[in-house]
């Protein structure tokens, strides 16, 4: 909300400067977003009057003006403005004046004629962008008066950023009320004595929807002059508040709305075809608004109708059919209390907002309607003339403001400072909050303009605002604290992040709420955790997997010509679990495990001249996953399985010590195509708890003896996983003390016979390499051969293997 400081100080004028006033308002919760001067700095510009004007002897478009600047002698000034005329009052930049932008005015000759100064347009003074002609000033101004004083150009424009709960401050008077409370300065309320009722004409009104309109007041005014000029003081205030002048009747309505926060509407009485009714709209009804927009109505929108013709969108905007024009002679002035819930969101449905709807959907004072009707009427009669009829004021359903109790002890506990009882009483008095003291409690009845006071904490906030947040001492919280030792065998979240980052992955953070389609496509989840009030319609469910969010970021980067992307996210997912009860960090029925997910797309390594380019594959990312587990990687198993997000033939379930902990694989071809990626990303998702546990290293003496390497090739069933044979080897080493010298075993070759037409290959050859080493003695050939034989026997027994010749 924007307004000039001078308007505010006409209602309350504390003895503090502009900067201090802005600071006080901001610290009280009315954030002053910006202050700027009403006009840029300039000097030497005065009010002047053109006494005589003559054509320039040597230029058709220039004229020679004789100007009275109040000095007693006429100045000769050459001017080319089309509106220059004798008798016109205009700004004059005298010789030596400095205009905005640093322009200095001196004596000059223009086509041979001396010019001692410059007559100015509004743009040359930085007041507006209008440069079509000279700025025309009121004729009542005295020549020689400094233009800054004459037009009050040393004013300051305040821009407030109000929170939605402070609807009472959406007016100059509302802000003035706050300033008076903060500074103790007397407040002058805008008011007008009831105007004489000189006609008895009434327009009948029926309120058919009390849940829409709680109070409706109006009066007929006849014989107005709609062509009357809006006073300069009113136009200036409106312009400095960001409103353009339209016509006297419209300007008066806007002026009162800005000054006291009362939206009103002026109907052209002669265009109203019947009695007025206030009701909810009906299906099929339409209305052309004042902004030229035609809207289709429905029963969720309130309207004012004349007979059966809709004339106004209740609390939002009037209709074009009954709008006032310069030819209007008779008007109906209306002001009403519209229930905030009946107005909220209605204007946004039609993709616009109005000053009226902005106020009504937050709450407008319902008790001061008659006084404001009188204020508007007085301005209309003073400016446009006319005769006023009686006020028709109907109250059918007004809010009932329940008293709110504030315990003084509770106030002290919340604020952390003991505000004296007498000071609390003084604060409530200055804020205009009627109260009763009951023991140590204050029972406050919220005024009709304070829709934000409903609970005890609201009153405590009022005390804090006026008492002053800066007066509340900074006291560190005192609480029992106990440092818990982190087990050495457990890693924290930051340690895991560092591990993943060391594998060349970059961390991202996605929303926890996602599209419902993502859950269906990527996680196969039909039991969704839906949001009651999503921040956006497409972010309506809680995620049960991190994979979809990572794929979306890969797509985002691919669309921006990135060729290699490696990302990870550590975050919570959400699963339905009827067995889960409420807890300090749990919500009943929803399990929230912490998961780690990663995605690799593009080159396996950064582009480099000495390394052939190839796309990242399953085994590259499998190696990354194994590296994250360190010494526990030997307990990992990658079991071929299917997952909705992954390629059915290139995905694996990850198990640790026999328990499933996640998934690894290429993205499903369907989702790869849907994301418009030219090759499939490889993704993984792991349970964080499995990663957090780690095996501590066991220190042992480094052997001084040479290692012996032996190979063993065996024929086995073609469908037998190599990991099954490695598990058999590990089990044999664990149970046979003679095999303790076997330090490592790896598969180094897989070979299959070339298939013959019509026959299926049933066997494959797996070649294993073993490293044997003793810490005490050098192994002889007999011991090595015995170890290899024992391993071969175990494999033959377990898998029906036979040695390859």
Curated annotation (Swiss-Prot):
For this protein, the Enzyme Commission number is: 6.1.1.20
Q: Where is the tRNA-binding domain?
A: 39-148
Q: Which InterPro entries match?
A: aa-tRNA-synth_II/BPL/LPL, B3/B4_tRNA-bd, DNA-bd_dom_put_sf, Fdx_antiC-bd, Fdx_antiC-bd_sf, NA-bd_OB-fold, Phe-tRNA-ligase_IIc_bsu, Phe-tRNA-ligase_IIc_bsu_bact
Per UniProt, residues of the B5 domain are 399-474
Q: Cite the binding residues for Mg(2+).
A: 452, 458, 461-462
Checking SUPFAM superfamilies in the record gives: Anticodon-binding domain of PheRS, Class II aaRS and biotin synthetases, Nucleic acid-binding proteins, PheT/TilS domain, Putative DNA-binding domain
The reply on keyword Nucleotide-binding is yes
Cofactors required: Mg(2+)
Q: Which GO terms describe its biological process?
A: phenylalanyl-tRNA aminoacylation
Catalytic activity, as annotated: tRNA(Phe) + L-phenylalanine + ATP = L-phenylalanyl-tRNA(Phe) + AMP + diphosphate + H(+)
Q: How is the cofactor bound?
A: Binds 2 magnesium ions per tetramer.
Keyword field: Aminoacyl-tRNA synthetase, ATP-binding, Cytoplasm, Ligase, Magnesium, Metal-binding, Nucleotide-binding, Protein biosynthesis, RNA-binding, tRNA-binding
Look up keyword Protein biosynthesis and say if it applies.
Answer: yes
Residue limits of the FDX-ACB domain?
A: 703-804
**GO cellular component: a single term:** phenylalanine-tRNA ligase complex
* Localization (cell): Cytoplasm
The similarity comment for this entry is: Belongs to the phenylalanyl-tRNA synthetase beta subunit family. Type 1 subfamily.
Q: How is the subunit organization of this protein annotated in UniProt?
A: Tetramer of two alpha and two beta subunits.
PANTHER family for this protein: PHENYLALANINE--TRNA LIGASE BETA SUBUNIT, PHENYLALANYL-TRNA SYNTHETASE BETA CHAIN AND LEUCINE-RICH REPEAT-CONTAINING PROTEIN 47
Q: What is this protein called?
A: Phenylalanine--tRNA ligase beta subunit
Species, as recorded: Bordetella parapertussis (strain 12822 / ATCC BAA-587 / NCTC 13253)
UniProt lists the gene as pheT
